[in-house]
Curated annotation (Swiss-Prot):
Superkingdom, taxonomy of origin: Bacteria
Gene: rpsU
UniProt-recorded name of the protein: Small ribosomal subunit protein bS21
Single Gene Ontology MF annotation: structural constituent of ribosome
Gene Ontology terms: biological process: translation
Family the UniProt entry places it in: Belongs to the bacterial ribosomal protein bS21 family.
Gene Ontology cellular-component terms listed: ribonucleoprotein complex; ribosome
Entries under InterPro entries matching the protein: Ribosomal_bS21, Ribosomal_bS21_CS, Ribosomal_bS21_sf
Keyword field: Ribonucleoprotein, Ribosomal protein
Gene3D superfamilies reported for this sequence: Ribosomal protein S8
Pfam families associated with the record: Ribosomal_S21
Protein's UniProt keywords contain Glycoprotein: no
Organism for this UniProt entry: Borrelia hermsii (strain HS1 / DAH)
Length: 69
C-alpha cells in the first residue's frame, strides 16, 4: 500500500506528484486495469501469441534493415 507523508512546508501539488510517481513505480494502476474485467484463459493465450508474433516480426525487420545497410 502506498502512503505519502506530507510535510508542513510541502505543497499539495508536490505531494500529489510524489504519490503518482509511487503508484506508477509499483504498477498499481496497470494491475487494476488488467484485473478490471475477467478474461478467459484462451483469450489471454491468444493475446500473448499475437504479441510474440509482433515482437518476432519487429526483430526480423530490424535485422533486415541492419543487414541492408
Amino acid at each position: 500500500m502506498v502512503t505519502v507523508n506530507v510535510d508542513k512546508n510541502e505543497g499539495l501539488e508536490k505531494a500529489l506528484k510524489r504519490f503518482k510517481r509511487m503508484i506508477e513505480k509499483e504498477a498499481i494502476i496497470r494491475e487494476w486495469k488488467r484485473r478490471e474485467y475477467y478474461e478467459k484463459p484462451s483469450t489471454i493465450r491468444v493475446k500473448k501469441e499475437k504479441a510474440f508474433k509482433r515482437k518476432q516480426a519487429k526483430k526480423v525487420r530490424k535485422l533486415k534493415q541492419k543487414i541492408g545497410k
